[in-house]
Structure formats: structure tokens, C-alpha cells
């Protein structure tokens, strides 16, 4: 498998949750040839329920699709009520180590139909590609491979010549039919399913093999999403999901390490060693973000676990001026930073790494948030996508790095227009909220007298 670097260039969402249609570019003013030369930061702002979180969830959904994992168990309920299908389209720049570069557009349509015993499944997928030469696209994007189910749930593959090349012979046609049926039953993508990829690898479609492998590897190792579930676990004092991508003992650890908040926990020695190493790797950055603070494990001893292996009983403590305090007594902001810091470090140092964080500002001091984003913008390498309500980043980031949600479900994401370099984006946003002047309304107007009356009447009802 060739080594590759990947950057997300754009994302389009249709009929997912409360977004009928919304699209945006990740790097508006950056030439494709220079896409890997600097970080890409994009923040989403808007009123509650306007589609900010849907962006993070759409990226998380694509990650599951490209990893060959099943769709969400409640996927049918996430399709907009006014439609029977949802589509996400995501465009990449893929650069291989042999010098070849491509623009690749993946589009997946998920439909709910009465004929699906599983409630919903993929109705269509398409992979389009265009070669990049000297930083420019050479010609239009062409259909690399696609299929669409007809009314009888039978797939129509295009281009037919490529499909015939992949499934030469009756035996492979049967294997392809089985792969399609399995992907429908398991609610997985056909393009990224192990069964279909086994057929693909046995074909002569080298270009398609390399592109599918690159996207699958990117989804597995370099694309991460942090949703409100993480923040909820922290807020409930349940666990701190320590999200990591970390090289440890000749292997790469990927996922969430659960850190107990209710007192000491016992984990096997391998998990403890990994946790200790991750904390040590973050120590300098954490101390720079929160001066005087360090986090370390306090070991209470070792004991035999149920499976017969040796475990370590420990809990995390925060240390300030040689005084130790259980991590559950630290502020929610510190615990939130601890949870995502390893991924932020990975994103800062890896130009093919993307992390999307919902409510990045939750519990975080606004000056610290602004300083962190400024450093990432100036000297980072990867991609950061975040949602926020704190307006401090509007004074730090350029206008092209901020996307605002609208009240129009048919056009959810826009950039503010008529913004000059000397304008304060924060002031312009507040002005647009109050008096308009943009292509779409940014928020539904709230009336003070109605709020006042509702509060008063509710108080009367409650005695």
C-alpha cells in the first residue's frame, strides 16, 4: 500500500437531521498545491439547533462509512422528516508519495424504504476523481465507480466497463452480488466493505485500489470526531474519555481510554502503561495551557483481575504546588482539555490529520481558547473543525475560517459578506444578528416582552 496524505476540501450535507442542504469549503483561499503547507481551521457559529453539530456528526458518519462499519443504529431517525433519503458528499485532495495527486469526491446516499428489513441502507454511492497536475485540476471530475439501486433494489453499476473489469467471470459476479447483499443487511458501504475490496484487489483497477485504500486508512487513523457524548460523560462525572492516537511500543493506539472519575479503578497493565505514556507526552503542552498544572496517576497497588491477568489500581490526580487532588474535583474545562489534548497535538504535527470537536469552548477560558487557535493557525499542520458559542475566536481567525449557520434549512452554511480586513468579525456578526444585511437570516428573532411574559406566567402556574 502506498503512503498518502489527505486533506478534506469540502463537505456537502443533504437531508441529514435539520439540514435540508448545506455546503462549505475547508480551505477557500489556499491553492491545492499548497494545501499541505499550513493548517486548516474552520469554526461554526450560530443559534441553537441550526446545524452546527450536524457538521461534526456528518464527518463522524463518513468516518464509519469509510471504515466499513455499520450506519448508526438510529440512522433512520436522523434522515430529515421531509425526505426519505440523506446524502453526504465529501471532497478530498489525495497526494501519494510517488508524486501523484487526485481530487476525489465521495458521495453516499442513505435511504429509508419499506423493502429494507433494517429500516435504511445505502441506496447509492459514487466515487469521482480528477488528476492534479502542477497544482491544478486536469479536466473535469470523472466517475470512477458508482452504483444506484433501482426500484427492485437491484444495483445499476457505472461505468459498466470498470465493473466488468472488477467482476470478470461468473464466480466473481456471484461474489459481487453476495457482497452487495451483505452490505445491505449490515448497513455498510459497498465501496468500503471487505468483501467488495477483496474483489477490487484481485482486479487490474490500480488507481481505484489505491484511492479506496487511502481513504479507508485516513478514516481509520487520521480522522477523529469528538461529539457531545464526550462532554456529557465528563459533565456527569462518569468517565473522562481520553481520546488518543499514540504510537506505543511499536503499535499505534487509537480510540478512547476511559478514565474513572468516581475513585480508583483497576485496569490491566498494558492499558495503564499506555495511559501513563499518553499523559507524559501531553505534560508539557498541558503545563503551557494551564500554568502550574500537571496530571499524573496515583497508584494504589496491583491486583489480580478476573481474567487472571495482573492489573493496576489507580486514579488520576491533578498536581498544583505539590498538592494533589482527584481529577473529578478539577474544573470541567480542564477535564475537557485533557480529553482532547492528545488529538490536538496529533493534528498540530500531522498535515494529514483532521479532528472535529463539538463545543470546543465548553468550560474553556475564552482567552486560552483564542490563544490555542492562534497558535494552531500560525504554525500547525493539520485540520481542525469545531463548533462554539464563545465569540472570542471571531477576533482571532480570518473571515474565511468562520462559517455561520442560518435559519434557512435549504442554505444552512454561509460566510459573512462585505467584511473588510480592518473589520472586527465579532462586531459584524452581532450587527448581522440584530439588523440583518446578509444573504440569509442568521437567527430567529427573540422578543424580550414574550420572554418576560412567559417567565412571569410560568411562575404564576408554579405558585
Where are the model-predicted features located?
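Short, surface-exposed beta-strand/loop "edge" segments at domain boundaries and coil↔beta transitions
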Residues: 19-20, 96-104, 128-142, 305, ...
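Switch/communication elements of ASCE P-loop NTPase nucleotide-binding domains
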Residues: 1-69, 73, 308-454, 460
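Short secondary-structure junctions
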Residues: 69, 100-102, 286-296
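Long, charged, glycine-rich C-terminal linkers/tails
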Residues: 73, 292-312
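Electropositive, glycine-dotted interaction segments
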Residues: 112-290
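Short beta-strand micro-motifs enriched in acidic
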Residues: 27, 107-121, 300-305
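Short polybasic amphipathic segments
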Residues: 11, 88-90, 119-132, 312-320, ...
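Conserved P-loop NTP-binding catalytic core
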Residues: 42, 56-115
Amino acid at each position: 500500500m502506498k503512503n498518502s496524505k489527505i486533506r478534506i476540501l469540502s463537505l456537502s450535507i443533504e437531508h441529514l437531521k435539520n439540514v435540508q442542504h448545506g455546503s462549505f469549503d475547508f480551505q477557500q483561499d489556499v491553492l491545492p498545491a499548497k494545501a499541505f503547507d499550513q493548517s486548516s481551521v474552520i469554526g461554526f457559529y450560530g443559534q441553537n439547533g441550526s446545524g452546527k453539530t450536524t457538521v461534526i456528526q456528518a464527518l463522524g458518519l463518513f468516518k464509519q462509512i469509510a471504515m466499513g462499519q455499520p450506519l448508526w443504529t438510529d440512522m433512520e431517525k436522523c434522515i430529515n422528516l421531509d425526505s426519505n433519503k440523506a446524502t453526504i458528499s465529501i471532497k478530498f485532495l489525495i497526494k501519494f508519495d510517488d508524486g501523484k495527486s487526485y481530487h476525489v469526491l465521495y458521495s453516499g446516499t442513505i435511504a429509508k424504504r419499506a423493502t429494507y428489513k433494517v429500516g435504511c441502507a445505502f441506496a447509492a454511492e459514487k466515487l469521482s476523481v480528477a488528476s492534479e497536475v502542477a497544482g491544478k485540476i486536469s479536466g473535469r471530475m470523472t466517475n470512477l465507480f458508482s452504483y444506484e439501486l433501482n426500484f427492485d433494489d437491484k444495483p445499476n453499476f457505472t461505468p459498466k466497463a470498470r465493473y466488468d473489469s472488477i467482476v470478470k467471470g461468473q464466480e466473481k459476479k456471484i461474489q459481487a452480488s453476495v457482497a452487495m447483499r451483505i452490505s445491505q443487511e449490515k448497513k455498510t458501504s459497498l465501496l468500503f466493505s471487505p468483501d467488495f475490496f477483496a474483489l477490487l484487489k484481485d482486479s487490474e483497477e490500480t488507481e481505484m485500489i489505491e484511492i479506496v485504500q487511502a481513504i479507508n486508512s485516513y478514516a481509520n487513523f487520521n480522522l477523529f470526531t469528538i461529539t457531545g457524548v464526550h462532554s456529557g460523560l465528563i459533565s456527569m462525572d462518569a468517565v473522562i474519555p481520553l481520546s488518543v492516537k499514540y504510537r506505543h511500543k511499536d503499535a499505534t493506539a487509537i480510540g478512547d481510554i476511559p478514565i474513572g472519575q468516581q475513585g480508583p479503578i483497576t485496569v490491566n497493565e498494558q492499558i495503564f502503561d499506555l495511559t501513563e505514556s499518553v499523559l507524559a507526552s501531553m505534560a508539557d503542552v498541558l503545563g503551557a495551557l494551564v500554568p502550574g498544572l500537571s496530571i499524573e496517576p496515583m497508584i494504589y497497588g496491583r491486583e489480580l483481575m478476573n481474567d487472571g491477568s495482573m492489573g493496576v489500581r489507580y486514579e488520576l490526580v491533578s498536581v498544583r504546588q505539590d498538592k494533589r487532588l482527584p481529577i473529578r474535583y478539577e474544573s470541567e474545562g480542564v477535564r475537557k482539555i485533557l480529553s482532547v489534548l492528545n488529538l490536538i497535538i496529533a493534528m498540530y504535527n500531522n498535515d494529514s490529520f483532521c479532528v472535529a470537536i463539538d463545543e470546543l469552548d465548553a468550560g474553556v477560558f475564552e482567552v486560552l481558547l483564542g490563544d490555542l487557535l492562534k497558535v494552531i493557525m500560525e504554525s500547525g499542520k493539520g485540520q481542525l473543525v469545531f463548533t462554539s458559542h464563545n465569540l472570542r475566536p471571531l477576533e482571532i481567525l480570518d473571515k474565511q475560517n468562520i462559517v455561520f449557520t442560518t435559519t434557512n434549512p435549504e442554505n444552512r452554511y454561509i460566510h459573512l459578506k462585505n467584511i473588510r480586513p480592518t473589520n472586527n468579525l465579532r462586531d459584524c456578526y452581532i450587527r448581522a444578528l440584530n439588523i440583518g444585511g446578509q444573504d440569509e437570516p442568521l437567527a430567529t428573532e427573540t422578543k424580550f416582552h414574550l420572554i418576560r411574559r412567559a417567565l412571569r406566567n410560568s411562575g404564576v402556574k408554579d405558585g
